[in-house]
């Protein structure tokens, strides 16, 4: 679980937000897989938009289906976010959209990092 060491993970960490351009979703799923392997109850979500996973993971990926783009998920409600923070050991949040670009300049409303991250 070298990845967990690299990011400085410890048992006190409850919410991890991923920001920046390129690689957030892949990194989120890799971290979730590592946490799952050490017995943590983990869930992935977003405060922006993510593509629906194409493969099945051993952990849930939660988002609100987008009406205008069925391939994507958007943020869950505040109530659902608060619920999953109570129900899961670790919540991983993709908190910054980059639309697949490897470099970006954030807008004034970005990133959307949860207060408890």
Regions found by a protein language model. Give the residues of each.
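Walker A (P-loop) phosphate-binding motif
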Residues: 2-38
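General beta-strand structural signal in soluble alpha/beta enzymes
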Residues: 18-19, 42-47, 62-64, 91-97, ...
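Phosphate-binding/switch loop-helix module in NTP-utilizing enzymes
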Residues: 69-110
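Gly/Ser/Thr-rich active-site loops/lids in small-molecule metabolic enzymes
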Residues: 112-117
